[in-house]
């Protein structure tokens, strides 16, 4: 079934009706974004658990009536798999944990749905959140001690303890830091605060490194999600809730959802995840903080040990560079 209407598309949209696939691209001075959307018909090799209720086992009915009822209540499972990629530079003034970045928005979803045929579009009712990969990259030289704390929260949830989807702490002394979160739940497209479902909060601790107006780092993120006509359409892979890329394990640690096991003992830190933060780029206003403590209260000795470890790693890196350069 061809899900997309036959009409002229904009230059930023690549349309392949034969493969039921669309690619959206946009790039300007503010950053780059790219989105892929592919229909379920092209992903038949993905196994799914069927949720069925056989009406003929509930009601006694003639064979002919049974066939008519079965046909009348049959339902096609519409699924559109989407991958959204965005990159933006962050002002150091906006990297203080006082604003949030929405990783998926109602406007973005409506843009995807607008490209579908009306008979398919009006059946879509759910968005399933599969995975979020986040990469932070410094816009300054390597070797500067620059701790960074990040939290991904569902800001629709009032409890600050329960809203946490995942949190990570790292250091941009090595230039970049990357981690992945697997939300693995579905929400209605009509939920009131859809834009707050995936809210990224970032706190750059070295606040005196630059002045307001200077771009301190780049945030690149990828969100994998699916648009469907049912809450029962999707099965998720059994990944951990949150994970650090292997290469960054030595310079960071993570906090998973409460029922998960923390795999790193160095997890004594906190980040402000107060509700009603301003949107990234908007004017901020003063508000009462609400810090979520990760692990036990951090002691000064733990902080000193962490800084010493980072300093030692930087020294090792410097020595390696000297060996490579033959100094």
UniProtKB/Swiss-Prot annotation:
Superkingdom as given in the UniProt entry: Viruses
Coiled-coil portions: 297-327
A Pfam family hit: MP
Transmembrane domains' residue ranges: none
Keywords: Coiled coil, Host cell junction, Host-virus interaction, Transport, Viral movement protein
Localization per record: Host cell junction, Host plasmodesma
Quaternary assembly: Homotrimer, through the coiled-coil domain. Interacts with VAP. May interact (via N-terminus) with host prenylated Rab acceptor protein 1D (PRA1D).
Role, per record: Transports viral genome to neighboring plant cells directly through plasmosdesmata, without any budding. The movement protein allows efficient cell to cell propagation, by bypassing the host cell wall barrier. Acts by forming tubules structures that increase the size exclusion limit (SEL) of plasmodesmata, thereby allowing viral ribonucleocapsids to spread directly to neighboring cells.
Protein name (record): Movement protein
Species in which this protein is naturally found: Cauliflower mosaic virus (strain W260)
